[in-house]
């Protein structure tokens, strides 16, 4: 079975790294994620990752609590750096070669984000982990995923969440909520479906970059998507 995609951008939330913990990084959870990523890398698909920081600090929450929003967002970017290093370390233990590139310069620790270098590393079979979001406050890591996916020529953004797709309502609160198999960007924006923020949706729509929303907790889901199987929800133009 041939791969449906040559190059993908995987968006991981910081919360996904917590597992069942209330805070931080659950080692067993990150190792399971890396095992799923390893399967995709072995298939020959080029994989880039944008990682959030909500398991450590959320800029939006900091702003809401009275902190200067820009300062809170920069703190959130530093949280993504910690997650990126943890993910790179777990990949190294699994035999996967990975590079971290940061939108904020931290030269003693990771490379700065340089687009041609990122593309070259993907072509050479390395996983590239993009840290620090877009490097600008007021932009989410979902928007960073849309931006980096567009920049490196990904064919799809794979949004890993705790639910197996986009629903008409929150399935945890509304038992009658139904899952969409496919939905357009305009429908998702007009219905205010809180899967990605409107800026990320609009950027992907304008770049004709589809998003597939799937559950990170479903074993083998990432591999099935790369092989072209119908998993989760496809958001398209």
Swiss-Prot record:
It comes from the Bacteria. The keyword Nuclease does not apply. One of its GO terms (cellular component) is cytosol. UMP binds at residues 53, 73, 134-141. InterPro entries: AceGlu_kinase-like_sf, Asp/Glu/Uridylate_kinase, Uridylate_kinase, Uridylate_kinase_bac. Coiled coil: none annotated. Its EC number is 2.7.4.22. It is found in: Cytoplasm. Keywords: ATP-binding, Cytoplasm, Kinase, Nucleotide-binding, Pyrimidine biosynthesis, Transferase. GO terms for biological process: 'de novo' CTP biosynthetic process; UDP biosynthetic process. CDD domains: AAK_UMPK-PyrH-Ec (cd04254). ATP binds at residues 11-14, 54, 58, 161, 167, 170. It catalyses: UMP + ATP = UDP + ADP. One of its GO terms (molecular function) is ATP binding. Pathway: Pyrimidine metabolism; CTP biosynthesis via de novo pathway; UDP from UMP (UMPK route): step 1/1. Inhibited by UTP. It is an enzyme of class 2 (transferase). Belongs to the UMP kinase family. Homohexamer. Catalyzes the reversible phosphorylation of UMP to UDP. This is Uridylate kinase. It comes from Burkholderia lata (strain ATCC 17760 / DSM 23089 / LMG 22485 / NCIMB 9086 / R18194 / 383).
């Amino acid at each position: 079975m041939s791969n449906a995609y040559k190059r993908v951008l995987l968006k991981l939330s910081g919360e996904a790294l917590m597992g069942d913990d209330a805070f931080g990084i659950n080692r067993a959870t990150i190792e399971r994620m890396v095992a799923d990523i390893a399967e995709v890398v072995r298939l020959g698909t080029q994989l880039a990752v944008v990682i959030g920081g909500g398991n450590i600090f959320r800029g939006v929450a900091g702003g809401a609590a009275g902190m200067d929003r820009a300062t809170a967002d920069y703190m959130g970017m530093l949280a993504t750096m910690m997650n990126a290093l943890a993910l790179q370390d777990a990949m190294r233990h699994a035999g996967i070669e990975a590079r971290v590139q940061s939108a904020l310069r931290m030269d003693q620790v990771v490379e700065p984000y340089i687009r041609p270098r990122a593309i070259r590393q993907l072509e050479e079979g390395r996983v590239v982990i993009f840290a620090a979001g877009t490097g600008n406050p007021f932009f989410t890591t979902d928007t960073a995923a849309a931006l980096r996916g567009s920049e490196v020529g990904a064919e799809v953004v794979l949004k890993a969440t705790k639910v197996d797709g986009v629903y008409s309502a929150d399935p945890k609160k509304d038992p009658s909520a139904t899952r969409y198999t496919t939905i357009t960007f305009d429908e998702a924006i007009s219905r205010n479906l809180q899967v990605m923020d409107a800026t990320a949706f609009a950027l992907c729509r304008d770049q004709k970059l589809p998003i597939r929303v799937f559950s990170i907790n479903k074993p083998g889901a990432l591999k099935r998507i790369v092989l072209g199987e119908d998993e989760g929800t496809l958001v398209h133009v």
